[in-house]
Amino acid sequence: MTTPSTEMPPPSLTIIVAATSSHLGIGLKGTLPWRLKPEIAYFKRATTYHPENRTNVVIMGRKCWESIPPKFRPLPTRHNIVLSRKGKVEGISEESAGVEVASSLRDALTRLKGSEFGRIFIIGGGEVYQEAMQMASCDRILFTEVKADMETDVDYPIDFRRDQEWARMSHEELEAFVGGEVHKGDIIEDDLSYEFQMWERKP
């Protein structure tokens, strides 16, 4: 007699990314090509809110981690996982609070199986986004569309806006997911226009 499999399904992954509308540029010389204060506040709220007040997880590549000013890392009130093929990152040890190192995205997700953490966010960079997009469990993208044609040297790997597998959700659904009011429509700051959006993979 065959015993039914009780293996838990892979956890849902949410990508959060800001990119240009023209070519989905996301980075320049190891950092963001812009600094938008409301976008930073939105990122913090989106990645910390959980309807059951659980601690969320943010997963990032080593270069993304190093682009965060040391005084702001690990990102507070979230469990940080930094990916490094070597399995180690300078300044992070087993005793480091709120942060750990995994050798790959799949390794990170294996570590999270059965944990009490909340939502899992993929926050960059390009290679990590690409690997996550290939996983069926990656089913949501919080996309900040920066409506400008700016110089970048790193682009988002897949234009999901033109992929029939993905659909843009309503603004009300975005607000429900992030747990509060979100500015609707374009925000203009420092001559840049940008908009908060949520996309989901079709079932």
What name fits each language-model region?
Residues 2-203:
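Enzymes that bind and transform nitrogen-containing heteroaromatic metabolites
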